[in-house]
Amino acid sequence: MNTYVRPALSLILLLAVVTGALYPLAVTGVAQVVFPEQANGSLVRDEQGQVRGSALIAQDFQGDGWFHSRPSAGAYATVASSASNLSPSNPALAERVAGDAAKLYQAGQGPVPQALLTTSGSGLDPHLPPQAVAYQIPRVAAARQIPVERLQALLEGATLHPLIGPPVVNVLALNQALSKFGL
């Protein structure tokens, strides 16, 4: 029996060291050299170098002077990141969407874009379609007393056109650019 146990335990120990230590260290080292910004979390910094968030994670922006992200089922917490898992027929989902729609519709800008009412699969999607951001421009312009045309130009400059998929806007990056206007 010892002839089988010793090689098996040795193999388990060897694989634990390789897959649990050597491989992660090698991948981290290569990532730090080749993609240092992404390896460190795609952090977004302000002019003073302070970290304001990650380009990969949505934030809860409050107040009329900011563009708002899409709703989050996990309160924008990375640990509790998840979808709501509520079915379309669930009354709790219908109540939340109706409440959000009523708040957004008060601005009187027409039908509310779906992206401002629905959560993403992770609950932390940092991107919105340009139409959902454009819907918020009159509210932000009024709160900051900035011409609508200036915010539309800011939106056009912040719109990303990925190789695959529709155009998107990173709300954190857009609000970072907006912060340069002051409040």
Curated annotation (Swiss-Prot):
The keyword Transport applies. Pfam families: KdpC. This is Potassium-transporting ATPase KdpC subunit. GO terms for cellular component: plasma membrane. InterPro entries: KdpC. The keyword Cell membrane applies. The chain crosses the membrane at residues 11-31. It is found in: Cell inner membrane. GO terms for molecular function: ATP binding; P-type potassium transmembrane transporter activity. It is a single-pass membrane protein. Keywords: ATP-binding, Cell inner membrane, Cell membrane, Ion transport, Membrane, Nucleotide-binding, Potassium, Potassium transport, Transmembrane, Transmembrane helix, Transport. Part of the high-affinity ATP-driven potassium transport (or Kdp) system, which catalyzes the hydrolysis of ATP coupled with the electrogenic transport of potassium into the cytoplasm. This subunit acts as a catalytic chaperone that increases the ATP-binding affinity of the ATP-hydrolyzing subunit KdpB by the formation of a transient KdpB/KdpC/ATP ternary complex.
